Amino acid sequence: MIEFIQKKLFEFQDLKYKEFHSKLMPTINQKSIIGVRVPVLRKFAKEVFKEYSIEDLKPFLKNLPHKYYEENNIHAFLIEQINDFELCFFELENFLPFIDNWATCDMFCPKVFKKVAKKKPEEILLPLIKKWISSNEIYTVRFGIGILMRFFLDEKFDSSYLDLVSSINSNEYYINMMRAWFFATALTKQYEATLPIIENNILDLWTHNKTIQKAIESYRISADTKNYLRKLKK
């Protein structure tokens, strides 16, 4: 299974895309990038998941860390397809510590999470998010913030979720960038609840300013609000 997937990935290789995409991935060894576009990877992962059983896929899923960046992305997209929550969580927990870049971290969300989110996400997803956010692994923390942002800033919102992310104390760029993304998104969806975080300087300086920058870039925020946010930059 491992050799089969690697062989197919090289068949999909796009050298111009490899050159472009490599520049966006400073945290990983450039030699590990084959150069396969995400839509191609996602389509291939769906085909593999449909054709093979989880048992068939286990040699690949257990082969961590993977040799190639695109193998990580295939792994993520395979996890995304698993419909059984417990099995999905098991495979996700095994995989998260091996994520070594922002792109793999951000490009997938298990479909079963979406089903859970429609029922009782506070009972099932929220404890997992809190666990991930307290991790020592950069991209596990980032993943947790991303899932919180995806499922808990709309009708399931509670102001305590803002405190959960604001209380993260990290010097890691890829964690703080996700924190800024979270708060910028929160400003577009829960403005009244989120604004005091900015007005009262709750965040560290870098995340504070990056949040404002990203919010100002959003088309979902009015011109008047953007002008006010500009005045809050430090």
Where are these regions (language model features)?
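Alpha-helical scaffold domains
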Residues: 1-234
